[in-house]
């Protein structure tokens, strides 16, 4: 974060102008008394910048908003929170932005493909944005362009965890034009430019005169949101805003590069308007400078790394650094071009591509345009690069190999039709991936909720306990497409995961055969029969399958020699720290700040019965916000089994029980202490820790019960 060392008055803007350490110094002709006054204000700014005000807002609300947790889901409307004084706060009735584009450090924002934006002065601190983490993937900066401290960065891989923030498509020149494009009518009836920012600087919590320092920066656990009002639209190519007086999260060192969002009234969506540049204090009020999104600069970098080839339905061969375009089958010579490593090859208008060598594109990928079909043949040769980006309604028939020493990143809404066993891992962000061979990929990682894996052959997934498929935040869809599939556990971290069968003529059996307690957080729908059968002569009470997502099928569910629970899901919230406090010598390192924060909010939690807000847990039995799980099926067949319906479950279907026990309205419930964080090891492993306790909520069952023996 740039500290603003000098301010001066601008007749053009009618306000104070910040001059950062990166900008030209204030002119020597400036009145000395004015400069001295502004300097003292700027120095005071470093004191006032100690950031998250929890005097009337729970600390967790700032984190939940930036991390899209709790009530702050992307697109949510009419969101209100209860303040510590009992009042309601409504965020000016704004919808909630999708902050998934924010890197874990908060100092950069993905904008799609292999690109992100930040500020140029972050290069001084490698922790900020030189390596960017999204969920379980790390990306490295390979090139950049900057102007006026705004920086566009090129990464070494296509980012799969997010489609990225939508960049602002226009840059109004005046405040009145900006007010027209981005202004909203606030609760007091006036029209203002109100927005959000998400970042993770050197976080401290302020309660009156008390300050709780975390001694932490760039922590994803502490990614927090600010609510602001733009007060000046153009100040040396930047905009200036001030923070909300109630929901008050002041920017501080480490917040540089974090993204600022405004609602675009024309596009009817949130857009990224710039990145955080610096701060200053004026009359005791902190102001923040945002360097505006520079579309021209972004386009220049993208053009530098794009090599466009119009196939127009023809053939192309690639060998080493040579790419040869054949206008037709009779054209054996073709037209030859040189390709440059680290550039993206952009194919248009459909056609055929033949690899004649092992290809290493470095940080370059292959991009296919919209609405066409492409055939890729490798003749046993391999491709390696940033990934594959397929446009809407395009299909790429992939009859080549991806390098086994790398991970294929697939983005774009189009379809990758994989026709060969790859012997590699894949990470999927968008679109369809069709599997046509047994064990097509070693492991599959689905992120963002926009991708789908379609089985087109029996055993096309892996054969380990997770079947080699892992669903991280917001997950994605697995379409069984008429094929049976067995799991010991499904590695899904939240309800963004859906397992379906789109084949309406052929039932698919989804078998989950866990022999220890396990919670599946996702959804099951379509033409699926769900089974949980343990091969044993005795009932395995430990083999408990807990469903806290949803089931919607017209088919049967079958449980033998095991236990099944259907319940709702305790909504996940942000935590303050995911690792334990390793300091045991209080006299050396002081009291654990997480404990201090909990104690600071304890009186309010006692008043509102809200200990769950400060307990540093993602989920709690006593929290009031449980999602209702809806479970619909034809008949549940129980054989030597236990079945229970716990809190916040709505179950519709008949039950046929043989030597089995049924509990409707079970007082016991289950939570996953790692919910939302289950996926580990670069995306290809799964952990779960389950707790059970008394927790009572509404239960509903509709159907008939037939019991035998």
Task: Describe the role of every protein-language-model region.
Residues 349-420, 457-550, 614-709:
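Extracellular, surface-exposed repeat architectures
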Residues 50-81, 106-122, 145, 215-245, ...:
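C-terminal subregion of chymotrypsin/trypsin-like serine protease catalytic domains
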Residues 150-250, 254:
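Chymotrypsin/trypsin-fold serine protease catalytic domain
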Residues 455, 495-497, 566-632:
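Acidic/polar low-complexity surface segments
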Residues 77, 81-138:
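Catalytic histidine site
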Residues 321, 414, 428-436, 449-451, ...:
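Glycine- and acidic-residue-biased ligand/ion/polar-headgroup-sensing regions
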Residues 14, 114, 118, 153, ...:
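Terminal peptide-recognition signature
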Residues 4-30, 44-49, 299-382, 550, ...:
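Solvent-exposed adhesion/ligand-recognition segments of exported proteins
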């Amino acid at each position: 974060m740039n500290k603003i060392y000098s301010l001066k008055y601008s007749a053009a803007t009618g306000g104070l102008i910040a001059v950062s350490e990166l900008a030209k110094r204030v002119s020597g002709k400036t009145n000395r008394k004015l400069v001295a006054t502004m300097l003292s204000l700027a120095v005071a700014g470093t004191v006032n910048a100690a950031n998250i005000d929890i005097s009337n807002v729970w600390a967790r609300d700032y984190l939940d908003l930036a991390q899209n947790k709790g009530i702050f889901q992307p697109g949510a409307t009419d969101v209100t929170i209860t303040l510590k004084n009992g009042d309601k706060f409504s965020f000016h009735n704004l919808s909630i932005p999708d902050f998934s584009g924010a890197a874990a450090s908060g100092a950069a924002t993905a904008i799609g493909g292999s690109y992100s934006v930040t500020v140029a002065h972050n290069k001084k601190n490698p922790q900020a944005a030189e390596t960017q983490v999204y969920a379980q993937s790390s990306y490295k900066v390979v090139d950049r362009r900057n102007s006026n401290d705004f920086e566009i960065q090129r990464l070494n891989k296509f980012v799969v965890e997010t489609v990225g923030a939508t960049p602002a498509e226009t840059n109004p020149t005046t405040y009145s034009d900006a007010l027209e494009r981005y202004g909203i009518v606030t609760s007091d009836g006036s029209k203002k430019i109100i927005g959000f920012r998400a970042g993770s600087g050197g976080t401290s919590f302020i309660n009156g005169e008390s300050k709780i320092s975390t001694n932490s920066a760039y922590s994803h656990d502490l990614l927090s949101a600010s609510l602001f009002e733009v007060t000046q639209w153009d100040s040396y190519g930047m905009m200036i805003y001030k923070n909300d007086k109630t929901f008050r999260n002041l920017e501080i060192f480490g917040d540089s590069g974090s993204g600022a969002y405004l609602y675009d009234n024309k596009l009817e969506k949130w857009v990224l308007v710039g990145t955080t540049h610096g701060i200053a204090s004026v009359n005791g009020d902190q102001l923040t400078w945002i360097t505006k999104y520079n579309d021209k600069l972004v386009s220049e970098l993208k053009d530098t790394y794009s090599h466009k080839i119009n196939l127009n339905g023809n053939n192309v061969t690639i060998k080493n650094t040579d790419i040869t375009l054949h206008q037709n089958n009779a054209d054996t010579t073709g037209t030859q071009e040189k390709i440059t490593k680290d550039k993206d090859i952009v194919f248009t208008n459909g056609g055929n591509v033949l690899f004649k060598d092992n290809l290493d594109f470095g940080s370059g990928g292959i991009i296919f345009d919209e609405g066409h079909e492409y055939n890729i043949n490798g003749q046993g040769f391999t491709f390696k690069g940033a990934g594959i980006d397929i446009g809407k309604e395009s299909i790429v028939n992939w009859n080549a190999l991806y390098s086994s020493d790398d991970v294929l990143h697939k983005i774009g809404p189009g379809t990758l039709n994989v026709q060969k066993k790859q012997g590699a891992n894949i990470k999927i962000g968008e679109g369809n991936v069709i599997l046509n061979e047994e064990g097509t990929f070693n492991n599959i990682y689905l992120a963002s909720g926009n991708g789908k894996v379609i089985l087109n052959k029996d055993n096309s997934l892996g054969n380990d306990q997770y079947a080699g498929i892992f669903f991280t935040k917001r997950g994605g869809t697995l379409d069984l497409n008429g094929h049976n599939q067995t799991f010991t556990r499904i590695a899904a971290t939240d309800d963004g995961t859906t397992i379906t069968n789109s084949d309406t003529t052929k039932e698919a059996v989804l078998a989950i055969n866990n022999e220890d307690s396990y919670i599946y957080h996702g959804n099951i729908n379509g033409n699926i029969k769900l089974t949980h059968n343990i091969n044993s002569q005795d009932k395995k009470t430990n083999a408990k399958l807990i469903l806290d997502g949803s089931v919607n099928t017209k088919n049967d569910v079958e449980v033998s020699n095991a236990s099944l629970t259907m319940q709702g899901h305790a909504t996940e919230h942000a935590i303050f720290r995911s690792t334990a406090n390793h300091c045991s010598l209080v006299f050396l390192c002081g009291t654990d700040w997480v404990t201090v924060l909990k104690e600071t909010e304890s009186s309010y939690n006692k008043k509102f019965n809200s200990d769950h807000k400060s307990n540093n847990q993602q989920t709690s039995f006593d929290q009031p916000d449980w999602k209702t799980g809806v479970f619909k099926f034809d008949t549940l067949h129980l054989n030597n089994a236990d079945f229970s319906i716990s809190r916040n479950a709505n179950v519709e279907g008949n039950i046929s029980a043989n030597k089995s026990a049924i509990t409707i309205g079970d007082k016991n419930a289950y939570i996953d202490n790692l919910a939302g964080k289950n996926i580990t090891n670069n995306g290809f492993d799964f952990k779960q820790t389950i707790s059970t306790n008394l927790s009572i909520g509404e239960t509903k069952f509709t159907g008939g019960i037939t019991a035998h023996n």
